[in-house]
Regions:
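Carbohydrate-active catalytic/glycan-binding domains of CAZyme proteins
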Residues: 1-320
Length: 320
């Protein structure tokens, strides 16, 4: 699934879907979710639709799409997440709603003291030591408690037991949130956690190997690439341990000119391997954005991504 844009970053068509039986040869299956011509629609032409992700719900037999939505004419102020459903992965997906997650719900890793507002909360200057301390202590969680938490760059993850999670950049892009979805994957249960408060992570991509969860993220440099970050945890809600930059070798400082978007598990009868999928943005011509795919391996408990000019997928293993 990908964002169909023109030269700018606004949605003009919707979310396009491609299919493949071998991960080499791909078919353009058309538009899975169309923007609306109704100017009053939340997904009208000219809104911002980013990071679409689709998961399948075994119980309802629905394909569920979540995405980052910004309302037309509001820049990136809305910070909402939208949801749509379809009986087919090809669509058409029916748009249901958008909102900010977990209104009226405190994170599970938030103390009683953190819930108390301070008289100085609205007077702090950004990037000062006082602001940084307040941010880590939940400044924006408290601010957005009633209306719901901000949700921008996002991904989805379905665990072994069928539980699904919505992982998104929140708190003015300063902190990641991991939020549990309802059994039908169409809403939030209210159980959520703050991850790496004040860590300035976006573009989350998450996967699980054995009983360990791994996550790769990006720093905040707009459309420009930066060194990736990696983390691991034994519980989806953390605590998450920082592992450093998973990219190794030349151009690792810009993650091979990419930003994380998804980690694709490749499953065989005997093993599972993983492919790092990264976006190569072109801010001067957004429709010309590209992907890079590289093998991802776990070495000494840490994910590693190395550049290869060419590589082959053999079952669930990789060959140069």
């Amino acid at each position: 699934y990908g964002e169909h844009k023109n030269k700018n970053s606004l949605a003009q068509v919707g979310v396009r879907v491609y299919s493949s039986k071998d991960l080499y040869n791909w078919t353009n299956e058309g538009v899975a979710l169309s923007v609306s011509e109704d100017p009053d629609s939340e997904i009208t032409i000219g809104s911002v639709i980013e990071r679409p992700k689709v998961i399948y719900n075994e119980k309802t037999q629905n394909y569920v799409m979540w995405f980052h939505l910004e309302l037309k004419g509001q820049g990136y102020a809305a910070a909402r997440t939208g949801v749509a459903t379809s009986k087919s992965p090809m669509g058409p997906f029916t748009y249901l709603k958008s909102y900010r997650p977990n209104a009226g719900q405190w994170p599970i890793n938030f103390s009683e003291d953190q819930k108390l507002s301070s008289a100085s909360d609205n007077k702090l200057e950004w990037w000062t030591p006082e602001w940084t301390t307040a941010l880590k202590n939940g400044l924006y969680v408290r601010r957005d408690f009633k209306e719901g938490q901000m949700s921008r760059d996002m991904t989805l993850f379905v665990d072994d037991d069928g539980s699904a999670y919505h992982i998104h950049s929140s708190e003015e892009n300063q902190t990641l949130h991991i939020a549990e979805l309802t059994d039908d994957y169409l809403g939030f249960t209210g159980k959520w956690a703050r991850i790496q408060p004040g860590g300035q992570n976006e573009a989350p991509a998450i996967f699980k190997k054995g009983s360990t969860y791994y996550m790769i993220t990006s720093g905040l440099t707009g459309w420009a690439p930066n060194p990736a970050r990696s983390f691991k945890a034994t519980s989806i809600f953390g605590p998450w341990e920082s592992l450093g930059n998973p990219a190794k070798g030349k151009h690792s400082n810009v993650t091979f000119h990419s930003q994380s978007t998804f980690i694709l598990p490749v499953v065989s009868k005997t093993d599972t391997s993983y492919i790092y999928m990264g976006d190569r943005w072109n801010p001067k011509n957004h429709i010309d954005g590209r992907y890079i795919w590289l093998p991802l391996e776990i070495n000494n408990g840490k994910p590693e991504i190395k550049w290869q000019d060419t590589w082959q997928l053999q079952g669930s293993t990789f060959a140069e």
